[in-house]
Design a protein with these regions (language model features):
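Conserved helix-loop functional segments at active or binding sites
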Residues: 1-8, 43, 61-64, 92, ...
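Catalytic activation segment of kinase domains across protein kinase-like and atypical kinase folds
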Residues: 26-67
């Protein structure tokens, strides 16, 4: 699937836009009183890229209610309800028909979680050169968190596909049906 996604990107079937580049939950400022997002912060990552990948990374972050550094790793799950409400809000503002790329959202969520799992693991194996750490096995722990999120996500793909369908986006049926065979 990674090769297929890269092929889609290389054939320019997905539009490039200005993206945030790191839309994790901790980079959102919230108005607590009115309960809405005021702004994205940490703008050093803004660049040209693919909106669907930024959206996938945002979903990766908001779906894990235990957080990036949970006290109890057992609580790491892909929370489909958080994603459902986020997508309803997102697509109530953003024109879902504007981009062909949204049909590949499950694949890109898979890709971003898988990529982070591997990046944290590689950094741990290479003596923690890239990501800042608080303790020696910090990146190994981060990799485990992402791996747990990935395995939970795989189980939730059919539900995610249904949620996308409910808001008018047909997801790529091949990926969803292939995942169902293995889960």
């Amino acid at each position: 699937y990674i090769y297929s996604l890269l092929l889609i990107l290389s054939k320019k079937k997905i539009d490039s836009n200005v993206i945030h580049g790191d839309p994790k939950l901790s980079n959102f400022l919230f108005d607590i009183q009115y309960k809405y997002v005021v702004s994205l912060i940490d703008l050093d990552t803004v660049s040209s890229g693919f909106c669907v990948i930024d959206l996938a990374d945002c979903i990766r972050s908001i779906s894990n209610l235990a957080g990036e550094e949970p006290e109890n790793i057992e609580k790491v799950v892909f929370d489909i309800n958080s994603v459902k409400y986020f997508l309803q809000g997102y697509f109530s503002i953003f024109n879902k028909n504007k981009s062909y790329s949204f049909r590949f959202l499950p694949e890109f969520i898979y890709l971003i979680i898988f990529e982070l799992t591997i990046r944290f693991l590689i950094d741990f194996l290479q003596s923690n050169r890239y990501f800042e750490i608080k303790y020696e096995t910090h990146n190994l722990f981060r990799s485990e968190v992402q791996y747990r999120l990935l395995t939970s996500f795989l189980v939730q793909i059919p539900k995610l596909s249904n949620e996308l369908h409910d808001i008018g986006i047909s997801s790529s049926s091949t990926f969803v049906s292939d995942v169902q065979k293995f889960v």
